[in-house]
Amino acid sequence: MANIKSQIKRIGTNKKAQERNKAVKSELKTAIRSVKTAISAGDKDAAVKAVSLAGKKLDKAASKGVIHKNQAANRKGAIAKQVAKIG
């Protein structure tokens, strides 16, 4: 345990940020999972809507610093490519 007052405060701040980041990452996984289920079902309309929502969540996470902007771009591109393959 830290002895310095500022470090004790920092531990609490870091814990809050960690919980917030974990929640955002969980939302991202859920959004991407919904895209993949729509793709596997072959439902193009649902997949397009899910990609839109997932892209929004990825951009938001990147702007908040939860994930890197390049990682967000790569994930968006990957799921968009998969949706484009649906006939």
Curated annotation (Swiss-Prot):
Q: What single Pfam family name could you report for this chain, choosing any that match?
A: Ribosomal_S20p
What GO terms are given for molecular function? small ribosomal subunit rRNA binding; structural constituent of ribosome
Q: Which UniProt keywords apply?
A: Ribonucleoprotein, Ribosomal protein, RNA-binding, rRNA-binding
UniProt record, GO biological process: translation
From the UniProt entry, list the residue stretches annotated as the region Disordered: 1-22
Mention any one GO cellular component term assigned to this protein in its UniProt record: small ribosomal subunit
Q: Which family does it belong to?
A: Belongs to the bacterial ribosomal protein bS20 family.
Question: Which HAMAP family does its entry note?
Answer: Ribosomal_bS20 (MF_00500)
Function recorded in the entry: Binds directly to 16S ribosomal RNA.
Q: What is this protein called?
A: Small ribosomal subunit protein bS20
